[in-house]
């Protein structure tokens, strides 16, 4: 099994594609990044609505709130974690992964706090950790310690591939904004648990995106034999994300025939 989705389930320009709601999005994709929870907890009635708009084969990958990962730096936040997991509990059967997106200031010295935090989480869910501190990408003892600790706990290291967006010409505000915000870190395709998560940050150059994605075809084919990967496809202007799906899908299907036909959404050319 492989899960493929986008960083969000709605965008104003997707309305013209027929994607007007989470329910409609879920007809085309089997998972989604849950970025909204990084910034604020959804109201209980909103969580219930999300449950109503999806089925049990759909997967949400929600981020832990920034109040936990950034402000508290994983310390003395048991109440915040309980509040978050309780709020999201109606979606429990559809949680693909809860993941920590840690700031670049969270370095090797903070690893004891990470281990304590992960060890305190309920065992019923799958977890991921996305790091941004340079030493975790230096292939030294610090990175080895991180990977070893995640592996021992069965926690996935989230993989960010931002090569395409940082290789793009900065000819639009969307590109420039993405280049400012998306970390420019080495791509370390490390498998630490059974649900690897890849965030592929494309550019607006679909030919270049396809070229840079080729390395993932072999990796996904390999990982797919023993794990359940998640793949999220980004573009600087999220309106173009469905176009990236169309660009990469045929290559993905040749590698992973089980994904079936490309999602039946129109091409993006009419939007730009």
Describe the residue ranges of each PLM region.
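Residues lining hydrophobic/aromatic ligand-binding pockets adjacent to catalytic sites
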Residues: 1-272
